[in-house]
Amino acid sequence: LEAFRWSKISIVFQSAMNALNPVMKIRDQITDVMLHHGVDKSEAAQRAVDLFDLVGIEPARLDAYPHQLSGGMRQRAVIAIALALKPPMLIMDEPTTALDVVVQKDILEQITELRKKLGFSILFITHDLSLLVEISTHISIMYAGDIVEKAPARELFENPKHPYTLGLMNSFPSISGAKQKLVGIPGSPPDLVAPPSGCKFHPRCA
């Protein structure tokens, strides 16, 4: 499992400040994973510089501690760590949570550019459907631990089929077109200890 982690699949957690060690310099946190996987020390040091260039941070910032970086820079640093061993798959768990919309946009553009340049795949986990249309080719909608709908991104946004997907689509405002009243999803999430039979969403179907 250790050989698999970071070399075949890596993860970007939703809170960069919590994901980073507060008492280690960023440089050490990037090189640590490479050294653990047998990369030569000098090669790891150069790779850390290259990774910071890649994610748009001045290499001089490698000697900073996490609290000395802005939220957007910390998120980029976490992405750099995740890419240290060039994994073909990157899991991103709410990578733009707690960032303002301008920084969110910059991070998403950075991720898209890196994916084009390096050719890795992304499993992007989020509750914000507006982010998915920016970055995804295919989308799976989960409710209470089950995938209730999956489709190509454009198809899902233009013609959602499942009532839960429709509820999600109606619960956030559109930035274009006529004004529409936002509609919440009635009811409460199910008790997963004793879930309803059949589709777990059926007690909330309107």
Predicted feature residues:
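ABC-type ATPase nucleotide-binding domains, specifically the catalytic core motifs of the NBD
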Residues: L1, D28-E43, G56, Q68, ...
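ABC nucleotide-binding domain signature
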Residues: E2-A3, S7-Q14, V78, L123, ...
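Short amphipathic alpha-helix in the helical subdomain of ABC transporter nucleotide-binding domains
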Residues: R5, A44-A48, L62, M169
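Short helical segment in ABC ATPase nucleotide-binding domains corresponding to the A-loop/adjacent helical element
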Residues: M17, V23-L35, A45, V49, ...
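Short catalytic/signature loops enriched in Gly
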Residues: V55-E58, L62, P152-A206
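Conserved ABC ATPase signature
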Residues: Y65-L69, M73
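P-loop NTP-binding/switch modules centered on Walker-like glycine-rich loops
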Residues: P87, I91, P95, L99-K181
